[in-house]
Amino acid sequence: MKRTSFAQFNCSLAQTLEVIGDWWTLMIVRDAFFGTTRFEAFQQDLGIARNILTQRLKHLVEQGVLERRPLTKGRKQCEYVLTEKGRDLLPVLLAATQWGDRWAPNRRGKRVVFVEATTGRPIVHLAPSTARGKPLRMEEIEPRAGPGASPEAKARFSLYSSS
């Protein structure tokens, strides 16, 4: 049976996938980070069908990831710009890109390099770290039930907790 929604899941990752889980959606967000704002530019860059692009842009606007702004008064032309919620997806895109660079590499090298705008220096690889900046390995991280966890999740997490 094909799942069409994660809306009923009490899980932050599931709720994130409700917003950006479709592969076209994340590519649209990527292009918005790269500066694309116009429907035609999204379509040309991605090679996406107009009806699919229309649906995904509408979804991203409804979810508050993009804002639809008219270009001029009285005309139908508009642009799509990232909201604060959309800009907060930058670490997700960077992490996914870094994963792709490692596990689905291009023979000629990285497809895109993210740099600090003022210096041109590459940004540091995103990785989990302590509040003091010490990098953490997977073995040093464990999930724990948060205040919004369901009773079932609290029971499940208690099985894995080392404390």
Model-derived segments and spans:
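N-terminal leader segment of winged-helix/HTH proteins
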Residues: M1-I20, F157-S162
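N-terminal helix-turn-helix DNA-binding core of bacterial DNA-binding proteins
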Residues: C11-I52
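Basic, amphipathic "hinge/linker" alpha-helix immediately C-terminal to the N-terminal HTH DNA-binding motif
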Residues: G21, T72-L93
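Residue-level detection of the helix-turn-helix DNA-binding "recognition helix"
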Residues: Q44-G47, L57-K58, E62
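Beta-hairpin "wing" of winged helix-turn-helix
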Residues: V61-K76
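C-terminal regulatory/oligomerization modules of transcriptional regulators
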Residues: L94, Q98-S163
